[in-house]
Amino acid sequence: MRVTDFSFELPESLIAHYPQPERSRCRLLSLEGPTGALTHGTFTDLLDKLNPGDLLVFNNTRVIPARLFGRKASGGKIEVLVERMLDDKRILAHIRASKAPKPGTELLLGDDESIHATMTARHGALFEVEFNDPRPVLDILNAIGHMPLPPYIDRPDEDADRELYQTVYSEKPGAVAAPTAGLHFDEPLLAALREKGVEMAFVTLHVGAGTFQPVRVDTIEDHIMHSEYAEVPQEVVDAVLAAKARGNRVIAVGTTSVRSLESAAQAAKSDLIEPFFGDTQIFIYPGYQYKVIDALITNFHLPESTLIMLVSAFAGYQHTMNAYKTAVEQKYRFFSYGDAMFITYNPQAISERP
């Protein structure tokens, strides 16, 4: 399959640069996987689409202020984007500079250049940086870091993004991008879903900066997926197995929840799904056999991205591309701060190719 098979025309005007004033008032395009039928509505329509006993699986990662500005002690400007926190003193990061720093390079970080750090090692495209500061890394990032808005949101981050670019249930700091399908859930909607009898469970996948990297090969089978840390604890496994046993659906909120659950299913030795704690490089594209999820809530993704490939593997290629064409025609808002889709599984998708 070719990467260009997953391309579509998107006017710049449809890229959302700010979220809706009210989280749950975004538009919702529902795609019936088996038939391809499309329905237009709003996000709160989920109350009608979900049944008592259905299980929603959320990603409770929390976005860290992962973008740092500063300079090398020798003078050159740098931009640091944290990929992951290694411990209380060290980070693994992408560094943008006119000349890549060498191990031992001293860095002065923060808008006032008050934080001292040292680049200690290089691991491929990533740099290991150690802070010379008594505070834990997370405290330093909260003090001097900027929210890492995606590259297609063409504006500086604002104070409001510290909350707007978080899900209301975010709990575990470590992501450099929000699991954006979850941004549409507010407390009233969550309460109404609970009242209806919808079950909820929480995985953790710390979204890395690699999620924004373009696919740089022509043939998608040649793509090497970036690695991200995921946790699927025992209580999630129990909730999934219980939902399946009673004939209810497992509904992933976002592609990161999909990748967490399917990673846990791939690693399972005896049951449908077993607890999973570790890095995952799972790459889901047409031909993949889904094992766990029955429905998916997700935003609209970039052309030629691994995420539109994941959706195509779930709903079927033709149904997915037709839904995106319709979304453009109907002027849905795209990407992280944009509108959402509710998709049910298409069992025929596994045998469909572009």
Swiss-Prot record:
Pfam families, alphabetized: Queuosine_synth
Reactions performed catalytically: 7-aminomethyl-7-carbaguanosine(34) in tRNA + S-adenosyl-L-methionine = epoxyqueuosine(34) in tRNA + adenine + L-methionine + 2 H(+)
PANTHER family xrefs: S-ADENOSYLMETHIONINE:TRNA RIBOSYLTRANSFERASE-ISOMERASE
This protein's name: S-adenosylmethionine:tRNA ribosyltransferase-isomerase
Organism whose genome encodes this protein: Salmonella typhimurium (strain LT2 / SGSC1412 / ATCC 700720)
An individual GO BP term: queuosine biosynthetic process
SUPFAM superfamilies: QueA-like
Primary location recorded for the protein, binned into one broad class: cytoplasm
Stated family: Belongs to the QueA family.
EC annotation from Swiss-Prot or TrEMBL: 2.4.99.17
Annotated coiled-coil segments of the chain: none
Main function: Transfers and isomerizes the ribose moiety from AdoMet to the 7-aminomethyl group of 7-deazaguanine (preQ1-tRNA) to give epoxyqueuosine (oQ-tRNA).
Cysteines engaged in disulfide bonds, as pairs: none
Compartment list: Cytoplasm
GO molecular function annotations of the record: S-adenosylmethionine:tRNA ribosyltransferase-isomerase activity
InterPro entries assigned to the protein according to its UniProt record, in alphabetical order: QueA (IPR003699), QueA_dom1 (IPR042118), QueA_dom2 (IPR042119), QueA_sf (IPR036100)
Catalytic EC class: transferase
